[in-house]
């Protein structure tokens, strides 16, 4: 079971790929109505703790806010089941390509060391650049990239298209889909 924290465009794309591989997908996003997830066959949880209790794989797709700082901590990692719906041991896995600081790196390292967490993949760190002496970097079940997860030709092409579409929308008198202060403009 894959749990997605945040269920915007990127998370919805991840959900489609996971479903194509036969994964059961769950999500938590306090800002989206349940109908958004239901429409694409994803189970939306109203409580983030329930997501951790249900899923062995967590992928982060939310912004860093006061509420999401260290959202993934020792307490929540310990809630993860480590077994799939067929009661087969598959371990617990976390991926964060969203924002540094959402994962409590010390808690994640302790969970890796204890075996509660099977693998951790980070493209973002709480403090960047990450300290080269960090014990996290030496752990055999840690996979990291230096905040370059979106540095692909395809991703940069998509960003260019998104910007062009937003500019065109505004020039035609509309409000761009990516506007973060929509309320202030109305």
Indicate where each model-derived feature is located:
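Glycine-rich NAD(P)-binding loop of Rossmann-like domains
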Residues: 1-13
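Aromatic pocket-lining residues of Rossmann-like dinucleotide-binding sites
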Residues: 18
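Residues at the starts of beta-strands that form the adenosine-phosphate
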Residues: 23-24
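Rossmann-like adenosine-cofactor binding region
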Residues: 32-135, 151
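C-terminal helix-to-coil terminal segments
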Residues: 78, 126-186
């Amino acid at each position: 079971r894959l749990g997605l924290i945040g269920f915007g465009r990127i998370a919805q794309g991840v959900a489609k790929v996971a479903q194509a591989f036969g994964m059961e997908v769950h999500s938590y996003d306090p800002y989206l109505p349940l109908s958004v997830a239901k429409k694409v066959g994803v189970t939306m949880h109203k409580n983030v703790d329930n997501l951790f209790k249900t899923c062995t794989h967590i992928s982060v797709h939310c912004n860093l806010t006061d509420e999401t700082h260290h959202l993934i901590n020792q307490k929540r990692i310990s809630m993860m089941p480590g077994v799939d719906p067929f009661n087969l041991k598959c371990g617990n896995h976390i991926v964060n390509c969203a924002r540094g600081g959402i994962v409590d790196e010390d808690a994640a390292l302790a969970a890796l060391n204890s075996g509660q967490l099977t693998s951790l993949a980070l493209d973002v760190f709480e403090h960047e650049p990450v300290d080269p002496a960090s014990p996290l970097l030496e752990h055999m079940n840690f996979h990291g990239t230096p905040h370059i997860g979106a540095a692909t030709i395809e991703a940069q092409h998509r960003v260019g298209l998104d910007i062009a579409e937003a500019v065109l929308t505004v020039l035609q008198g509309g409000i761009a889909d990516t506007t973060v202060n929509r309320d202030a403009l109305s």
